[in-house]
Amino acid sequence: MSEAVPTSARKSRNAPVAPGPAPVLEIESLDMEARGVGRTITEDGEPGKVIFVEGALPGERVTYSSFRRKPSYEQATVVDILRPSVMRTKPKCAFFGTCGGCSMQHLDMRAQVAVKQRVLEDNLWHLAKLRAETMFAPIHGPSWGYRYRARLTVRNVAKKGGVLVGFHEKKSSYVADMTSCEVLPPHVSAMLVPLRRLVEGLSIRDRMPQIELAVGSEVTALVLRVLEPINADDEALLRAFADEHKVQFWLQPKGPDTVAPFYPLDVSLDYTLPEFGIRMPFKPTDFTQVNHQINRVLVGRALRLLAPSRDDRVLDLFCGIGNFTLPLARLSREVMGIEGSDTLTTRALANARENGVDGHTTFACRNLFEVTGDDIRALGAFDKFLIDPPREGALAVSKALAEIAQSGEGPLPKRIVYVSCNPSTLARDAGLLVHEAGYRLKGAGVVNMFPNTSHVESIALFERD
């Protein structure tokens, strides 16, 4: 006796059935993970399940195979593309689809930016019921060779013939068997195979799970996560590799605080912000933007929106090593940078001295995820804020400003520029700033910091009368 089939499954003509032909689906949109989204139609003509299809694009008609089924949705992969989108393009990378580093190489670059802009607008509307008064022109730059920071996994895999060095496979703990990477700078991509051979020759090839890379103006640093000490032969191999490939090795035996340079010792990492005459030294494990070219444009856009004057006191929250603080100091009377890490706060102060702006800057270490209205009041009056939080957003800061506004006790900045790497937390915080703190969302736009991925960076301007 066969099992009864649920009514909803019997009625959905697009629901997967095995055996038999793959179901057909019209793709309507892309979600935040760059998956095509469509909806099945029941035999009664009613909307059925939502299907998320990896590799499908809006406007396409595809067949698909589901690998995860839930009552209201399914996750699937494309089987065949029956009607391709005009936005579809040939991926540049031979490992696209297997490697998890990129998710949008099959989508035309202009369409990628348009999709990200729509994701930003949708988040603002659905989560905060907000529409920006102006949508800024997108910030974009090179599509390839832009990734100046990356964390590569190292795995000694006998079935693959030795050591693999690369990103994880898509939605997997396995390491992609990649020999090049189009989003890494060309000289780094060319090192992937030599790095494999280097690790294979080390005594600790099974005790080195990760290589973190950071590209500076003059040198590329490679941080080796070493679970056991290296021996003299290992040291000789690392020195020879560094000399041949013009890189600097750092070793990390334990936590981030144990990172130390190994060889050579007479070079240092930095990036520059030429528009403001800033040279920014950093260590390879410091947070810096992945895309140096876009970062330069972003800093310029942020400062033009904030429009600091020589009379302004500016507060830079989540200031890191001073990426915005130091340029602001060139244009403002005084800038205070606040960061949650003692290490980064110390680095920011050193960078201010390096660039001769320490007379206009002060720095403090505070937990900005627990800040209150009283904490903001205690800092004194600031004319403008720049907020650049991590993915978690600036919820406590936004609540603190809302509390100050509603109490009427304490000064508020007349202008805020908010740089975001997560559109959903930006929308949440924007809702507080507008609906509870009395600001207007004057403008917002995307920053294509990570081309060929679904990552959405954005910038927003808030003003208060």
Swiss-Prot record:
GO terms for molecular function: 4 iron, 4 sulfur cluster binding; iron ion binding; RNA binding; rRNA (uridine-C5-)-methyltransferase activity. The keyword Cell membrane does not apply. Keywords: 4Fe-4S, Iron, Iron-sulfur, Metal-binding, Methyltransferase, rRNA processing, S-adenosyl-L-methionine, Transferase. The active site is at C421. Residues 16-80 form the TRAM domain. [4Fe-4S] cluster binds at C93, C99, C102, C181. Pfam families: tRNA_U5-meth_tr. S-adenosyl-L-methionine binds at Q289, F318, N323, E339, N367, D388. Residues 1-22 are annotated as: Disordered. SUPFAM superfamilies: Nucleic acid-binding proteins (SSF50249), S-adenosyl-L-methionine-dependent methyltransferases (SSF53335). Its EC number is 2.1.1.190. It comes from the Bacteria. One of its GO terms (biological process) is rRNA base methylation. It catalyses: uridine(1939) in 23S rRNA + S-adenosyl-L-methionine = 5-methyluridine(1939) in 23S rRNA + S-adenosyl-L-homocysteine + H(+). PANTHER family: 23S RRNA (URACIL(1939)-C(5))-METHYLTRANSFERASE RLMD, RNA M5U METHYLTRANSFERASE. Belongs to the class I-like SAM-binding methyltransferase superfamily. RNA M5U methyltransferase family. RlmD subfamily. Catalyzes the formation of 5-methyl-uridine at position 1939 (m5U1939) in 23S rRNA. This is 23S rRNA (uracil(1939)-C(5))-methyltransferase RlmD. The gene is rlmD.
